[in-house]
Amino acid sequence: MRLSRFFLPILKENPKEAEIVSHRLMLRAGMLRQEAAGIYAWLPLGHRVLKKIEQIVREEQNRAGAIELLMPTLQLADLWRESGRYDAYGPEMLRISDRHKRELLYGPTNEEMITEIFRAYVKSYKSLPLNLYHIQWKFRDEQRPRFGVMRGREFLMKDAYSFDVDEAAARKSYNRMFVAYLRTFARMGLKAIPMRAETGPIGGDLSHEFIVLAETGESGVYCDRDVLSLPVPDETVDYDGDLTPIIKQWTSVYAATEDVHDAVRYESEVPEANRLHTRGIEVGQIFYFGTKYSDSMKANVAGPDGTDAPIHGGSYGVGVSRLVGAIIEACHDDNGIIWPEEVAPFRVAILNLKQGDAATDAACEQLYKELAAKGVDVLYDDTDQRAGAKFATADLIGIPWQVLVGPKGLADGKIELKRRSDGSRENIALAETVARLAP
């Protein structure tokens, strides 16, 4: 993509309405625009990051055996009355009526709808286990939306729903999602810690929140520092095998949100030097809720003996749009965003330091075409801005690799390669650049 043809409305000043780093940098970098309180338009740069995150989530869900579908944003109120949650959910749920006076709601979550789909088609235990997921926009009418995408009213979320014949099988499904989440967040360059948490309006008696430690987080957390060094399973993990050792390794080290924090256990189990009390950002949460929805909505299957019994369920959410903000909170410096490579909107930025110079223009064009041909996401700054402004833009939007091309270096057949994560620079041969940066 040529920057001269890209829509990148960068702001020079810090927006006054932005209270935290991620909100400020997303607005300054031209990633989004607020259209109403807690509702944003995703501009091209932000949209590219959103799609990268969404794809990682999708790949790890598929790897764990979940199957993608897509449910609508609007749901029938009668489904929620059937589960008993319509009146219990509260003012965060946006309730509307169509022209025929049918009561609808803009879905804040999808347990009822997926249970209705399941019960319409699945009648036997032989069709289990089953895990269905979708990635869809949701709406919760927060009383005080703030912090940009961290606490917006409209947000993109992945939610998966597992169906199993009994509790033992359901806990295996829960464990698969637990491990899938560890891998998902690690691929994004995040250290997300699973912590015991309240189940809230979803229900059930088992839940873990996945928390990224950050002082700007809304959740108070307590944990043993040892959890920060636990290994994340690699891509060879066998989701059909026994995942219990992995789960035990991660859950045997104390980590809890303040809602379920056990001070006595914390002080008895965690050495004082290892105690960490801080704040964090919730980027995902998983639940096992047993027969909560299958009982009320009569989602039964015939067991091996032919007797109908309610299925055991779980739900598993990832805040896809919230992750954009969480990554920025964890990965930034005074100059701007520092994107991990897997979620960066572009992997490489080519900076033409003397636009109009024939040799520099030709070298940049050649690099741009060769990198693009290799499948590299590349942004070529071919504008007539001065070099300092180009450096500032590249740092602000956080492109992992910057290729600095100017007449002085080209005279020796070299370009300067800058790594955004640590600011390191090196001179390399122009002829070696593509091989160095192509995956």
From Swiss-Prot:
PANTHER family: MITOCHONDRIAL RIBOSOME PROTEIN L39/PROLYL-TRNA LIGASE FAMILY MEMBER, PROLINE--TRNA LIGASE. It catalyses: tRNA(Pro) + L-proline + ATP = L-prolyl-tRNA(Pro) + AMP + diphosphate. Its EC number is 6.1.1.15. It holds the Pfam family HGTP_anticodon. It is found in: Cytoplasm. Keywords: Aminoacyl-tRNA synthetase, ATP-binding, Cytoplasm, Ligase, Nucleotide-binding, Protein biosynthesis. GO terms for cellular component: cytosol. Homodimer. It is an enzyme of class 6 (ligase). Its main location: cytoplasm. GO terms for molecular function: ATP binding; proline-tRNA ligase activity. GO terms for biological process: prolyl-tRNA aminoacylation. This is Proline--tRNA ligase. HAMAP family: Pro_tRNA_synth_type2. InterPro entries: aa-tRNA-synt_IIb, aa-tRNA-synth_II, aa-tRNA-synth_II/BPL/LPL, Anticodon-bd, Anticodon-bd_dom_sf, Pro-tRNA-ligase_IIa, Pro-tRNA-synth_IIa_bac-type, Pro-tRNA_synthetase. SUPFAM superfamilies: Class II aaRS ABD-related, Class II aaRS and biotin synthetases. Catalyzes the attachment of proline to tRNA(Pro) in a two-step reaction: proline is first activated by ATP to form Pro-AMP and then transferred to the acceptor end of tRNA(Pro). CDD domains: ProRS_anticodon_short, ProRS_core_prok. Belongs to the class-II aminoacyl-tRNA synthetase family. ProS type 2 subfamily. The keyword Oxidoreductase does not apply.
